[in-house]
Amino acid sequence: MSHYIKGSDKLVCKSPAIYVSSQVFYNKDLYDKAAKQIKFIKKSLKFYKTILSLPKGITFRLGSVKGSVNGYYVGKSKVLGLDVKLVDYSLVLSHELIHASQFYTKKLNVKQGTFYWNGSKVGRKGTTFNSYRNQPWEVEAYDGQADLTRKVIEAMMSSNVDF
């Protein structure tokens, strides 16, 4: 188990592996939001895989995410975290799956804390939102997340998937 999955997290689905923070089970609102996210992940993942090159064995974690972050993807351990409080989780899921694809296709790589984009070393991100947002992998993820979400939802609707 990755250190991004906590010992108190509960495995609620084996395929795909979805863990939920234990805090969710003590709050009805969070529980209801997590249930919707789980359903969407389970039903949408096969559609994402038709559009993106994704690694096998992505582990999902639903729980609190610190700071102003809505989600994250850790390339080496293939853990995708989503903030369980999100309303627009499909957009964040698309954003993080774009990162998963970037790592899987080696477009984005990290070696000893140094980021490489398409094989070229990229300087450290700055401390502002703009410097973070202007990193090439973030530009691609932000620019593509809405279109990817639309394509996946359209594919699900045309396949009569209830979500």
Language-model region placement:
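N-terminal low-structure segments adjacent to metalloprotease catalytic domains
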Residues: M1-A17
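Predominantly extracellular/secreted Zn2+-dependent metalloproteases
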Residues: S2, I51-S64
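Acidic/histidine-rich, surface-exposed loop or edge segments in extracytoplasmic proteins
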Residues: C13-K28
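Zn2+-dependent metallopeptidase catalytic core
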Residues: D29-L54
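Active-site scaffold of zinc-dependent metalloenzymes
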Residues: T59-S90, A100-Y104
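Post-HEXXH active-site segment of zinc metalloproteases
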Residues: V87, L91, F103-E138
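Histidine-centered divalent metal-coordination motifs
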Residues: H95, H99
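Long, well-structured alpha-helical subdomains associated
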Residues: T127-F163
